[in-house]
Amino acid sequence: MAATYIRCAAERHFARESMGTLMQATLPDCREALLSRYAGTVQCVYLDPPFYTGKCFDMKARIGEKGYRTGSPALTLLAYDDRWESRESYLSLMRETLLLARELMKKEGTIFLHVDCRMHAHLRLLMDEIFGESGFLNEIIWSYQSGGRAKTYFPRKHDVILFYAKSRSYYFSLKSVPVARRETRSNHMKRGTDEDGRTYRSIMSGGREYRYYDDEPSYPDDVWDDVSHLQQRDPQRTGYDTQKPIRLLDRIIRCSTQEGDLVCDLFGGSGTTAVTAAQLGRRFLSVDKNPLSIAVTGKRLQQILGGAGCFDVEAPCGADDCEVEAEVYPAISSYTVRLLGFSSPAAREAGIDGLDAVDQWSAGFVQGETYRSCVSSARTADSPALKTTLEMPVCAGEPCIMLVDVWGSRRYYLPQRRY
């Protein structure tokens, strides 16, 4: 029943035209590949880089069915390291990232750079240098409520999103992001009702009456205080530190892109950019050096898109140091694939038993050096148990399985054939 380890150069989930790509790599390592494939094609770039905090940020990885049901057992794993030798080393990375982003963008493209008070001033000057002062569009204030108090200064409860265009022919649609009209406080405007029964407020200026109807759509300005920070028990939570809410990315992507456009995130993290883009019918490119980012994002995409969506994964294969038991039963028009056992040095060291170390897996076929996933199972809060039997149709290629462990490492195996 022992499965045979193999290496695959690429991975495609489901057999349709791809909606996007998840790429595990450092930006210096993948720069040339990105430019050769995507230069001049990206409509919107969103970057949520490290904030120069001097800290490490974690991901809480739940273990097995019990971990997903109760929150324990779980591992605390490194999401990203935000410690730097110097401010210059940080700004050097950001310069190279922004230069790369500019090359990837279309002439009509825009970029949103998410920062906080630590590097805001430095990055604003860097954005002016790379995109030109004329490329500046907005300094968006994202104001939110979160825990924590300060006694020696006012509490810091906002981030800044720097919004720039690559050229003056950029695309932007404010009408695509209407917001609920708020109850306005009493002011000097006069209340009225027109002949159709519509209520409004009016003001006279320069001998002319200006009416503001209560049922007219309202649009956000450059202070966004209507998008909540993710709370600890928010269903969106993946366990990834500094995760951003879908509502925030929804507004950014809607106003700056149209259906079918390509959205890029070079600090992919928990995958909110890719997930939101897919939900809105946009294509996506998400890059991160941490295998956990690719694992979390891929799982979120499968949850949201199911069999209706297709995406590619480009990530290094995990080491050939695991013991996997899997078997496949061929039939006339389908295959039954069973995952029976898993063991790895990391799992044994962490005291994790068997399949509890597997967070997600899929069954599909190897065609050349590409693994094509047909059906999958992943642990989630709503579905903590991992399916150990999957049914898939007969397709061209060798039956194969892909496993992602709790550390985010992905490996490919040929299951033992049973007749």
Which role fits each region the language model picked out?
Residues 97, 243-265:
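Phosphate/ATP-binding catalytic cores across multiple sugar-kinase/actin-like superfamilies
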Residues 1-13, 19, 43, 124, ...:
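Accessory, often C-terminal, charged low-complexity segments
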Residues 79, 84-142, 396-398, 402-414:
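Conserved Class I SAM-dependent methyltransferase catalytic core
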Residues 74-84, 227-238:
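Short glycine/proline-rich turn/loop motifs
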Residues 40-59, 127, 263-277, 286-287, ...:
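Conserved proline-anchored active-site loop of SAM-dependent methyltransferases
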Residues 38-39, 125-133, 276-282, 303:
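Short, surface-exposed basic-aromatic patches at helix termini and helix-loop junctions that form
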Residues 1-100, 118:
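DnaQ-like (DEDDh/DEDDy) 3′-5′ exonuclease domain used for proofreading
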Residues 36-39, 103-104, 252-258:
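Glycine-rich helix-loop-beta junction characteristic of Rossmann-like nucleotide cofactor-binding loops
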